[in-house]
Design a protein with these regions (language model features):
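Solvent-exposed loop/turn and edge beta-strand elements of beta-rich ligand-binding domains
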Residues: 1-493
Length: 493
């Protein structure tokens, strides 16, 4: 028989090594994985995989093009050598380490790919991959500012804080925003918002509020000091340090997860309306002769006022505190004690609205731009009460009646008031009736009986005028008397 096409494959094989090193012994079992790619000298995958053996590592996904290799360093180890046998001479090996958090290669080749052409001399077929470990973790202080101040709210950057280390050196400074959150920056010039750690350990700090050189009146500053213990650990060895913190106040026991500084603000102040009085009719102002009241929405009197001689009205102060900051109040203003009959009083009820604001340094008061006076629904810029003076009065004319030869009895005789001597033009009252009167009974002392006549009411228009009246006895019908027909009494105003 004839045999043809017999091929003898005498490809020589050898080995190569992969040494895994770390810069310091690991303190716990640590795994590293590599992708090992292989090709023969012609660039094709390796066929006889059974020849390839790996010692010192766990192999997975082995195929014609390569395999995945896991290298495990035990606690305290810092290097391990893995050997690959049954590798054809001339094979091309590419080793790529899979990235591991926290670990970085020391002086890696380009693209971090280790290339190896297998030579017959196994000692020349060696690759060493060295890694170093680094980890970091931040601590961001958790601090809030609370202001107990009624309607007064926090202002941006109103309060300052400092964080010091155990040596008393300032490591961070901070200030608040209007919502109370305190943001810190490092004092090293980089102004980072957190302190970064690269090694496990325990760190102690203090946090306190910095009182300003000039303290605001009405503000009580916090004297609380927090001691913060920051604990840094590396439980997962993944490059990410675990950072925890506990806050302890010097004012209370127990750990807290954050620090809170509480300040209080107290303030007080007053406001009063500006209103005037106008009195027409020729009369002069009597100081304190007119009274006024200011009432709140519940109709409670909160202020009273009196006029001055120039017509200005002085009100008592309405008091406010920090609890009133930001609130808007509406009051009514009206004239009271309307008792004089010669005055026509103003029935107007003014309303005034005012917003109370913080003036700073413990003082509150009205926002003058918010003060609005209204009469009914109409805005007025100068609220004024207008009163009218109406003068009136009458003169009283008195006389006596003497009766000869008989005792005078009350009402026996009638007397009238006249504009003329002849008694033809009687003086009449407001109802149009002639003004008359009768005598009283005779006095014991002189036997005379008094009578009284009142003139008509005078008004302010009559001031300075002169009025002449005649008083006459009006004859009666009793024939036993002889009546006096002479009128001889006058009244001058």
């Amino acid at each position: 028989s004839e045999v043809s096409n017999i091929v003898f494959d005498n490809t020589r094989t050898t080995s190569f090594s992969l040494t895994k090193k770390v810069s310091a012994p690991v303190d716990a079992k640590t795994d590293f994985t590599f992708k090992v790619a292989w090709k023969d000298k012609n660039g094709k995958g390796l066929k006889e995989l059974d020849r390839i053996q790996v010692t010192g590592a766990t192999v997975s996904n082995k195929n014609a093009n390569g395999a995945t290799v896991k290298v495990s360093l035990a606690t305290g180890e810092k290097e391990k050598k893995i050997t690959f046998t049954g590798i054809p001479v001339g094979a091309q090996i590419t080793i790529t380490e899979n990235g591991k958090s926290g670990w970085s290669q020391v002086n890696p080749p380009k693209d971090s790919k280790y290339l190896l052409t297998i030579s017959e001399n196994a000692s020349e077929n060696a690759v060493t991959v060295t890694n170093s470990y680094s980890a970091s973790g931040p601590w961001t202080p958790d601090v809030t500012k609370k202001l107990v101040a009624g309607g007064r709210t926090l202002k941006d950057k109103e309060f300052n804080f400092v964080i010091k280390d155990q040596a008393g050196s300032t490591v961070m400074t901070g200030t608040n925003d209007k919502n109370g959150k305190v943001t810190f920056v490092t004092a090293d010039g980089e102004k980072r918002n957190s302190i970064s750690y690269t090694e496990p350990g325990t760190f102690t700090y203090t946090i306190e509020e910095v009182k300003p050189a000039t303290e605001e009146k009405g503000m009580s500053y916090s004297d609380v000091k927090y001691t913060v213990t920051v604990t840094v650990t590396d439980p997962k060895k993944d490059g990410k340090l675990k950072v925890t913190s506990a806050y302890v106040s010097n004012k209370e026991s127990g750990n807290k997860t954050a620090a809170e500084f509480v300040n209080t603000y107290t303030a007080e102040g007053t406001w009063k309306p500006t209103v005037s009085k106008e009195l027409t009719g020729g009369a002069s102002y009597d100081s304190n002769g007119f009274t006024y009241s200011v009432k709140d929405s519940a109709r409670k009197v909160v202020s009273t006022g009196l006029n001055k001689e120039n017509g200005a009205i002085t009100f008592t102060d309405i008091k406010y505190t920090q609890k009133d900051i930001g609130k808007k109040y509406t009051y009514t203003i009206e004239e009271t004690n309307k008792t004089r009959s010669d005055i026509t009083y103003d029935d107007t009820v003014f309303t005034v609205s005012v917003k109370i604001v913080d003036k700073g340094n413990g003082v509150v008061g009205a926002d003058e731009n918010s003060v609005v006076y209204k009469k009914a629904e109409t805005v007025v810029t100068e609220p004024k009460f207008e009163n009218k003076y109406k003068a009136s009065g009458s003169a009283t004319i008195t006389g006596t009646k003497k009766l000869e030869n008989q005792t005078l009895t009350a009402g026996a005789f009638t007397f009238g008031l006249f504009y003329d001597k002849d008694g033809k033009d009687p003086v009449k009252d407001a109802s149009g009736e002639a003004i008359t009167t009768t005598n009283k009974a005779a006095r014991t002392a002189d036997g005379k009986g008094e009578f009284v006549l009142n003139t008509p009411e005078y008004t302010q228009a009559d001031m300075g005028k002169e009025f002449v009246y005649w008083v006459r006895e009006i004859p009666g019908t009793d024939t036993h008397y002889t009546y006096d027909a002479n009128g001889n009494i006058s009244s001058i105003l």
